[in-house]
A protein has these predicted regions:
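Hydrophobic positions on the alpha-helical face of helix-turn-helix-like DNA-binding modules
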Residues: 31, 44-45, 55
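Short amphipathic alpha-helical boundary/capping segments
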Residues: 11-23
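A short, glycine-centered helix-capping/turn motif at helix boundaries
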Residues: 37-43
Length: 74
């Protein structure tokens, strides 16, 4: 077994590497709150001061492809 320790979880690595664009920092933070901390859309919307509809749109745009990449990497 390899004793190598990752600095990031696999999902956090994907979020940091694959989420790019004009508002990437905000989108990365939203995805980390959802996938790494397990918060609901409503909780994230309150923290980020956005509507839960906007949060859902971002999570579905980026999150679904990230989950697929994570599943393929295992």
């Amino acid at each position: 077994m390899d004793d190598f320790k990752y600095d990031y979880s696999p999902m956090e690595y994907l979020i940091n590497e694959k989420v790019t664009g004009r508002k990437c920092e905000r989108n990365r933070e939203i995805l980390k709150l959802r996938f790494l901390r397990g918060l609901t859309f409503e909780e994230i919307a309150e923290i980020m001061q956005m509507s839960d509809k906007q949060i859902g749109r971002i999570i579905h745009r980026y999150g679904d492809p990230l989950l697929i990449m994570l599943a393929k990497s295992r």
